[in-house]
């Protein structure tokens, strides 16, 4: 996993509350276990019409929002079933930061495990941030827990454990590998033959 220290990017805004994992990525696209290739199905039922043409009224389809790497959204994002495909789709689409009023617990952890930073922010701050010009770069500084635009500065908090994992690019496997020697020593001690 790539370390996450400072991220600069533009934002897309989807201020709906209670966006569940079925809306993030519909069930018909969950037949694969690879982590890539899901971005094209992100918010599929909202992004496309019945003829697979882009819905011009969906915020992520606005030309000025294409390429956004920060998603500003409503409360209780990622609720519903706990499929990891939802964070895979968001990451594959290009999002690195998700800002919401709150997250479903398992979805929140899955974001972190996949190198994305989920930030909990109150509605007034999100609405202020959502007014940022579509072309303006927003800077997210994880180490100092600060987000800045050309005109505003926002503070956010994150649990120390998750912060350290993201800053150092550590996933569960790389953390386990830090103890490889201890694991081998233990296996030698308890070997049955």
From Swiss-Prot:
Q: One Pfam family, please name it.
A: Aconitase_C
Which portions of this protein are annotated as coiled-coil regions?
none
What are the EC numbers? 4.2.1.33
What InterPro entries does this protein map onto? 3-IsopropMal_deHydase_ssu, Aconitase/3IPM_dehydase_swvl, AconitaseA/IPMdHydase_ssu_swvl, IPMI_Swivel, LeuD
Keywords annotated in UniProt: Amino-acid biosynthesis, Branched-chain amino acid biosynthesis, Leucine biosynthesis, Lyase
The reaction(s) catalysed by this protein are: (2R,3S)-3-isopropylmalate = (2S)-2-isopropylmalate
Q: Which GO terms describe its molecular function?
A: 3-isopropylmalate dehydratase activity
Establish whether keyword Ribosomal protein is in the entry.
Answer: no
- Under the cellular component aspect of Gene Ontology, which terms does the record hold? 3-isopropylmalate dehydratase complex
Please name the pathway: Amino-acid biosynthesis; L-leucine biosynthesis; L-leucine from 3-methyl-2-oxobutanoate: step 2/4
Q: Would you kindly state one Gene Ontology biological process term found in this protein's UniProt entry? A: L-leucine biosynthetic process
Functional description taken from the UniProt entry: Catalyzes the isomerization between 2-isopropylmalate and 3-isopropylmalate, via the formation of 2-isopropylmaleate.
Instruction: Name the family the entry cites.
Output: Belongs to the LeuD family. LeuD type 1 subfamily.
Subunit organization: Heterodimer of LeuC and LeuD.
The protein in question is named 3-isopropylmalate dehydratase small subunit
Q: Which organism is it from?
A: Bacillus cereus (strain B4264)
Gene expressing this chain: leuD
């Amino acid at each position: 996993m790539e370390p996450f220290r400072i991220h600069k990017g533009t934002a897309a805004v989807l201020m709906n509350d209670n966006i569940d994992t079925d809306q993030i990525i519909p069930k018909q696209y969950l037949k694969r276990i690879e982590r890539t290739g899901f971005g094209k199905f992100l918010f599929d039922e909202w992004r496309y019409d019945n003829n697979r043409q882009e819905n011009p009224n969906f915020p992520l389809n606005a030309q000025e929002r294409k390429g956004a790497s920060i998603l500003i959204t409503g409360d209780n994002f990622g609720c519903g079933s706990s499929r990891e495909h939802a964070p895979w789709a968001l990451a594959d689409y290009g999002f690195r930061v998700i800002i919401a009023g709150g997250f479903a617990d398992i979805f929140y952890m899955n974001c972190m495990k996949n190198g994305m930073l989920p930030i909990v922010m109150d509605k007034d701050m999100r609405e202020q941030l959502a007014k940022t010009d579509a072309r303006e770069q927003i800077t997210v500084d994880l180490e100092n827990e600060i987000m800045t635009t050309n005109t505003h500065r926002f503070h956010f908090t994150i649990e120390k454990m998750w912060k350290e994992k993201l800053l150092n690019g550590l996933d569960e496997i790389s953390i386990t590998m830090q103890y490889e020697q201890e694991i081998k020593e233990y296996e030698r001690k308890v070997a049955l033959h």
